[in-house]
Structure formats: C-alpha cells, structure tokens
C-alpha cells in the first residue's frame, strides 16, 4: 500500500513539475507531456515568444521527435542564435531531411562559413537541395560556391551560371546581375550581349544600380546617339534608385553630351 502511495505521489509530483515548467499553458503542457507533437510545437512557440528559451528547447525537441519538422528548424535556429553551431546543425539536418527548404539553406550556411567545418561540397549539396525545393537564395549561394570553388569543391563556372539564372528566376536581383555579367564577359557561358541585356534589364528594373550601369554601358558601346540616349536613361534609373556610382556616371555622361 505504501509503495502504491509513493508511486502515486511521484506521478503527481512529475505532473506538477511539468505544469510549472510549462506554465502558463497547462493544457498544452499536459498534451505535450502525453506525446502530442502539435501541442509541443505550439507550446514551444509560446515559450519562445515569452523569452523562455529553456522551456522552448524542451517543448520543441519533443515536437521534433514527434515528427513536427518545423519545430526541428525552430530548435536549430534557436541554437544557431546562441552560437551553438553543432546543435544547430543537428536540428537543421533533421528538418532538411524532411524537406524544410530554409533548414537546408541554413545548413549550407554553416558549412560555407566554416561554423561546422569549412566544406563547400557539403554547402553546395544542401544549397542545391534547398534550391530544388524552391528557395531562391540557395540557388544564388550554390552559384557563389561553384564560381569560386575550394574547400572540397571544384570550381565550375558553367554550373554557377545555371544557378545564378535559377536565382534570377526566383526574383533575386543580384543573381540576375551576376548571370548578366557571366553572359556579358563570357564567364562560364558563351558571350551573349543580348542575353546579358535581358538579365541586366530585369535586375535594373528591380532596383539594382550596378545592373543599370552595366546596361547603360551596353547601350553606349553601340556607338550611336540612340544607344547613348538609352544608356543615359538606364544609368539615371540606377541613380534614382539611390546608387551613388550610377549618379556619378550619370553626371559624367551629361557632361559629355554638353561638350558635343
């Protein structure tokens, strides 16, 4: 009888401890304690919003174990923010394995920046997966590591250009610009000024001043007044977008017109 009472008392104590740990969400706490992943995920987010990071870690880890993939990412991000790259990598991997694109991207960041180990091959692998899942920033980052190479990855400018184009398709202005440069200069792709013009135009129209400058130069280099006039217009667009270099080039081009 005494043993039964002791076991009951212990069970009550555990329940009370759980309630206290997860207060002020006792219902979620109870459901989470019983293994309900959705409740653990909700509880973890609640704890995060209240600044209770230890409670959040406990709840999110249970949610992650129960198959809540977004909680795996949230937990990875929490550890990442604390500077614990090793634990961040564990939970980013768990979420990436469940096709959470941003988690694959963050994992690629850890490898690219050397916070786990500096391994561009691993970074590229995770960026490509995130890119394939529709995360445009990862397409851009995959292009960057392929363009430079190193740290276990052979440079491949042709691959870099293809990923810059995919990033551009996803609306990233710097990807459009870099793809434009590749076609303009013949880096990793056949030199194609018409294709460069299209890519620069898209980037410039999205507010990327350097693309406006390069587009302006393409028109000016045609050597006729109409081309110069169009080029001036694109450079002015870069200036209007706040690009100081564009403004300087614009003023210089206007001076050239006045001298003629």
Language-model features, listed with the residues they occupy:
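Structural motif corresponding to the intra-repeat A-B loop/turn of tetratricopeptide repeats
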Residues: 50, 82, 114-117, 154, ...
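Hydrophobic face of amphipathic alpha-helices that form TPR/SEL1-like repeat modules
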Residues: 42-49, 74-81, 106-113, 141-149, ...
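Terminal, low-structured helical/coil segments at or just beyond the last alpha-helical repeat
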Residues: 237-260
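Short helix-capping/linker turns of helical repeat alpha-solenoids
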Residues: 35-36, 47, 66-68, 98-100, ...
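TPR-repeat structural position
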Residues: 37, 53, 85, 120, ...
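N-terminal Sec-pathway targeting helices
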Residues: 1-12
């Amino acid at each position: 009888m005494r043993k039964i009472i002791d076991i009951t008392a212990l069970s009550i104590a555990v329940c009370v401890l759980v309630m206290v740990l997860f207060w002020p969400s006792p219902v979620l706490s109870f459901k989470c304690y019983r293994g309900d992943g959705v409740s653990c995920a909700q509880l973890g987010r609640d704890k995060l919003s209240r600044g209770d990071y230890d409670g959040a870690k406990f709840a999110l880890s249970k949610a992650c174990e129960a198959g809540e993939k977004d909680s795996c990412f949230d937990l990875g991000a929490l550890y990442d923010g604390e500077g614990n790259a090793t634990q961040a990598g564990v939970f980013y991997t768990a979420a990436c394995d469940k096709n959470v694109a941003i988690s694959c991207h963050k994992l690629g960041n850890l490898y690219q920046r050397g916070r786990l180990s500096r391994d561009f091959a691993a970074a590229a692998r995770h960026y490509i997966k995130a890119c394939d899942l529709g995360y445009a920033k990862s397409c851009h980052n995959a292009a960057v590591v392929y363009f430079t190479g190193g740290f276990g990855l052979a440079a491949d400018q042709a691959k870099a250009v293809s990923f810059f184009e995919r990033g551009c398709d996803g609306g990233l202005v710097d990807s459009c610009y870099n793809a434009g440069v590749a076609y303009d200069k013949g880096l990793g792709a056949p030199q194609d000024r018409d294709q460069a013009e299209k890519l620069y135009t898209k980037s410039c129209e999205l507010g990327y001043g350097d693309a406006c400058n390069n587009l302006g130069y393409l028109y000016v280099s045609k050597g006729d007044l109409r081309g110069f006039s169009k080029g001036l217009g694109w450079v002015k667009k870069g200036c209007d977008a706040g690009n100081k270099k564009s403004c300087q080039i614009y003023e210089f081009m206007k001076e050239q017109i006045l001298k003629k």
